[in-house]
Design a protein with these regions (language model features):
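Charged DNA-binding/catalytic regions of mobile-element recombinases
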Residues: 1-234
Length: 234
């Protein structure tokens, strides 16, 4: 009975968790439970997620992948997510990730973000991290701006641009943005820009500190970063 109640509590607070993530969360809380039992209880309670998976194009499936990151601060990835306040005013959020540790290094929301602001956000991150070798970006105007080009030159960073019209070239950050939208942006009303910033930052901290990632051996990004010799930033 207690296991069933805890499963309900986790599912209610983390609406995009399937039974596998709930099983990991239970284990992290010290509960000894079989994953098959978690799956059975999850289904009995009608908590099944219904996810429509996108159809993968053959050309994308056969694309030669970029070399994977093998160390922290080797490859970062950057992109934008758009959303709105409760009154319809638009906002944009810059997402910045370490591809190896899966850490969300920054999620900065504003009404609009220029190339100069992108450079300033990167400078702020460099107060706690070393500069990466490469940053993967798309061909958006903020990323092809003179301000970011100059920043990259001054810090010895290569800007690795995606091919136009090929979001799969930066698939990791696209996947992260999907989680951000499902677990945060779609779960809240933002009453103001400050309210949006506070809720997005709270989710970023949860993602880094408390959300286990299957690709990291069910560790959180901060736990994995610590094992890799990085002192996780704020």
């Amino acid at each position: 009975m207690r296991t069933r109640c805890v499963i309900w509590e986790i599912a209610a607070s983390r609406i995009r968790y399937g039974y596998r993530r709930i099983y990991v969360a239970l284990r992290r809380e010290g509960m000894v439970v079989n994953h098959k039992r978690v799956r059975r209880l999850y289904r009995e309670e009608g908590l099944n997620l219904r996810i429509k998976r996108p159809r993968r194009h053959v050309s994308a499936a056969h694309r030669t992948e970029r070399a994977p990151a093998t160390a922290p601060n080797q490859i970062w990835s950057m992109d934008f997510v758009s959303d709105a306040l409760f009154d319809g005013r638009r906002l944009r959020a810059l997402t910045l990730l370490d591809v190896f540790t899966r850490e969300a290094l920054a999620i900065e929301a504003d009404k609009g973000i220029t190339g100069e602001q992108v450079a300033a956000i990167l400078d702020a991150v460099l107060t706690t991290r070393s500069a990466p070798q490469r940053i993967r970006v798309d061909n958006g105007p903020e990323f092809v701006s003179n301000a970011l080009d100059r920043w990259a030159y001054e810090h010895g960073v290569t800007l690795d641009f995606s091919r136009p019209g090929r979001p799969i070239d930066n698939a990791f950050v696209e996947s992260f943005n999907g989680r951000l939208r499902e677990e945060c942006l779609n779960a809240h009303w933002f009453l103001s820009l400050d309210d949006a910033r506070a809720k997005i930052e709270a989710w970023r901290r949860f993602y880094n500190e408390s959300r286990p990632h299957s690709a990291l051996g069910d560790r959180t990004p901060h736990e994995f970063a610590s094992l890799a010799g990085v002192n996780p930033g704020q």
